[in-house]
Amino acid sequence: MTRKDLLGSYGEREALAVYNALQLSGNFICFAQSFMHDEDYQVARNALWTLTKATDEELSSLQPILNELIDLAITTDNSSVRRLSMNVIERLKITEDNLRTDFLDFCFDHAIDPAEYPGIQSLAIKLAYKMCSFYPELKAELILTLENMQIEYYKPAVKSIRNRILKGKYRIKV
């Protein structure tokens, strides 16, 4: 897999073609580390989009670079790279031992920011819930935050995940 494969216009067909090649090589970590930090946001975005095509089992091979993915989500200025990196993070294991409070704060901030894109807000809520599940006091704080959202300012995707959590209908993927 080369950088050239990820340049330019990139649709579902291209994402699946690159994913199929990646699947054959099986080197998901090398692929992610080679391209997710690319200076061309299109390359980084296309690489991360390709990774979202992977099965949960395949993505689990990225567990050793969880912190790199978190750093990318926190620091990138590109909303597509942020959303796609958060999508990958959401599918990895977050435990009490690898929980990062800076990422939890980031998720809280982006979950309630009405100026943020709905896809990022929804993922931020899911990830915050996942991280708060280890600590009843943090979970209570998240629930209070979700209850106090002025929900009329949010898009349906955000309303949906918020309501599912508040009604106890959202289940964390293990």
Regions picked out by a protein language model, each given a short descriptive name:
Residues M1-V174:
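Alpha-helical scaffold domains
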